[in-house]
Amino acid sequence: MKMAGSAEKAPVKRRGKPDPKTYWQRRRNSIYLFAARQICARERRNPTAVIDIGSNATPTLEWHRKSGARLVSLDLRRPYVAEGVESLTCDFLEYNPATSYDLVTCFQVLEHVPDPAAFARKLLAIGKTVVVSVPYKWKKGRCKYHLHDPVDERKMKKWFGRDPDYSYIAKELNNVARLIQVYRQ
């Protein structure tokens, strides 16, 4: 595992993959992210430790900055890098935290990983509250980087091994939907 260094001045373009900065810019005012932020705030009002898994350089950890919590970003290639954020570049399935987290977030990641069940169960193992999102019922082939579309509640239950404590479907004005689920210990 390597620690990310200083913040990058320009986004790194990866062959065939969307630029994380552009990805965030296009989505930062979405209904989905508004809902995800409100759900995180409702779930953990005073967290002491928050980790975002699969950050892809997006600043969702900033939602928790005023809480004074320890902030950790973990991504296989591009963790979020900012002052006061512990940025980890590693494979989540190989990550073994010394302690559990009050809040674990994982937004738009499970549909990309080869073994979503192992990934989902590890999310549950490292945190007291897990907030996760996936594209909701997107047709197979809509996004060439998604390995598991369509994803719905049934598939999520299979991956997590249980029902969530609650779910919310965030539907954009263009009918693109995302499923946000909360799992508590």
Tell where the protein language model's regions lie, with residue ranges:
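Short acidic, S/G/P-rich loop/turn micro-motifs used as interaction or catalytic elements
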Residues: 93, 110-113, 137
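A short beta-strand submotif of the Rossmann-like class I SAM-dependent methyltransferase core
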Residues: 103-109
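Conserved residues at the C-terminal ends of beta-strands
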Residues: 107, 116, 133
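Helix-to-beta-strand junctions that scaffold the AdoMet/dcAdoMet cofactor pocket
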Residues: 113-114, 127
